[in-house]
């Protein structure tokens, strides 16, 4: 049945070392942070190359009727996936009967996919373009062989498993002797030692379940309904309830203001 929800795969055995990793050495990294002199609590919201402003974000959950169920307000420089855990936990506690969540591509992360599918629920998201080398081989030309746990490159060479890094990504590396004479190496890697490294998250299988849901008819219809539900909530909030611009300063005041507005809507 095409409407059957994707099911989590069996947990694979990880043959990596079980020894505890040492704590990372904290390096003093200098970075430029834009801070408002009027409201230091807000953050710089960036959306592509066309939108950049100091703002707050209202991470909002609504039901199929467009009724706001919960909201989390953060500075504009906080990624959408950061407040997800708190929102998700509160929603499933209040409404345990919920079986599916629909969200945009910002929420398609390994952690979020594992959290939702691990609870026997379904996450339907938009397509998320893989981040690959500009002008290089397409991402889908690197094929993962689940049986042998290796990556096959566009030239049909094997990249064997090397290690699992601290961020939860399994690293697969090529043979530099083969890559040194590869005719398409310029499309693959600019590494001086001729080693191509491909990473795959240990929870990638859960991300693939989200892709499966994207092609399932029932979840396709649910995703298309976003424009009539959550997007309509944001549109009405901005156009009819004066929420296009922040009227207060300070995170606490803005949070109370947003919750009061959504309660009235």
For the regions a protein language model found, what residue spans apply to each?
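Anion-binding and metal-coordination hotspots
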Residues: 1-265
């Amino acid at each position: 049945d095409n409407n059957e929800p994707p099911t989590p795969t069996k947990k694979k055995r990880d043959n990596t070392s079980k020894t505890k990793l040492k704590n990372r050495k904290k390096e003093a990294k200098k970075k430029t942070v834009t801070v408002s002199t009027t409201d230091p609590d807000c953050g710089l919201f960036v959306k592509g190359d066309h939108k950049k402003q100091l703002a707050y974000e209202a991470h909002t959950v609504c039901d199929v009727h467009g009724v706001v169920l919960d909201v989390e307000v953060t500075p504009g420089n906080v990624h959408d996936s950061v407040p997800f855990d708190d929102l998700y936990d509160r929603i499933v506690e209040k409404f345990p009967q919920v079986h599916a969540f629909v969200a945009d591509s910002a929420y398609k992360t390994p952690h979020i996919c594992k959290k939702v599918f691990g609870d026997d629920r379904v996450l339907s998201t938009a397509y998320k373009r893989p981040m690959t080398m500009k002008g290089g081989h397409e991402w889908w030309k690197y094929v993962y062989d689940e049986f042998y746990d290796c990556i096959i490159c566009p030239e049909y060479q094997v990249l064997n498993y090397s290690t699992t890094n601290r961020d939860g990504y399994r690293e697969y590396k090529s043979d530099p002797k083969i890559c040194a004479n590869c005719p398409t190496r310029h499309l693959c890697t600019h590494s001086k030692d001729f080693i191509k490294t491909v990473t795959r998250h240990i929870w990638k299988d859960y991300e693939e379940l989200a892709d499966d849901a994207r092609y399932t008819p029932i979840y396709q219809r649910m995703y298309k309904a976003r424009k009539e539900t959550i997007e309509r909530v944001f549109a009405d909030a901005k156009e009819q309830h004066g929420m296009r611009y922040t009227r207060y300063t300070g995170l606490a005041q803005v949070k109370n203001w947003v919750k009061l507005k959504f309660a009235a809507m």
